[in-house]
């Protein structure tokens, strides 16, 4: 097993993230202000402000492996994705986005928790064209306009290896042995999530990703 530091790509302070919304990890939007505590005006986020964007490079290798073989990649949650002291309220509102090899047509957006904060710490206050979003919608920016779409995020468990349950239902990436792949990592607060309220202010998390690789057609790590 090898470790590598995640290199931050954007210049946003990783110590202070603000609510944004996205459906594709390409276009993010924010609400610069509210009206009667409702987010009704939106603008495109410029220069990757308000969220974290980092990058690492991955290569599958192993003794006796050949370049014709393929390794399926999964997340390994044995060490937990965001450190052992992260507050659950932050996880409920956060999203982890992954883009492999620059292919933005296949973004992976993960929910880091399937729990919800107490009702007095939740709020649906995003309004688009006079309609309030429900808890399963996010904002899409296209051709200068903002619309509400279904939240594309999925549970992190769909891609995470669990020793007691075996391989997950989905594969992050099928990697050719020896080939180097880039991985762009996005960590942000989904502003349309009902859990994204003042209750998550001043909470911190350490972003650490572990991966589990299995040769295609085999069950070995």
Language model region names:
Residues 32-69, 74-80, 135-137, 142-221:
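C-terminal, structured domain-capping segment
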Residues 1-21, 80-160:
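A surface/secretory-pathway sequence property marking extracellular, secreted
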Residues 1-25, 203-221:
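Short, polar/proline-rich extracytoplasmic segments that appear immediately after membrane translocation
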């Amino acid at each position: 097993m090898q470790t590598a530091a995640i290199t931050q790509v954007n210049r946003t302070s990783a110590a202070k993230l603000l609510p944004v919304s996205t459906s594709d990890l390409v276009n993010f939007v924010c609400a610069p202000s509210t009206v009667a505590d409702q987010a009704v005006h939106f603008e495109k986020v410029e220069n990757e402000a308000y969220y974290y964007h980092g990058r690492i490079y991955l290569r599958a290798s192993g003794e006796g492996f050949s370049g014709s073989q393929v390794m399926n990649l999964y997340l390994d949650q044995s060490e937990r994705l965001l450190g052992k002291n992260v507050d659950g309220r932050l996880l409920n509102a956060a999203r982890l986005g992954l883009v492999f090899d620059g292919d933005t047509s296949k973004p992976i957006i993960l929910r880091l928790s399937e729990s919800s904060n107490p009702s007095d710490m939740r709020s649906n206050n995003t309004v688009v064209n006079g309609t309030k979003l429900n808890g399963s919608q996010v904002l899409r920016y296209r051709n200068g306009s903002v619309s509400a779409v279904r939240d594309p995020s999925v549970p992190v468990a769909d891609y995470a290896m669990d020793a007691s349950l075996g391989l997950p239902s989905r594969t992050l990436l099928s990697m050719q042995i020896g080939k180097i792949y880039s991985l762009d990592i996005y960590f942000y607060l989904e502003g349309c999530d009902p859990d994204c309220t003042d209750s998550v202010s001043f909470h911190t998390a350490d972003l650490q990703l572990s991966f589990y690789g299995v040769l295609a057609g085999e069950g070995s790590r």
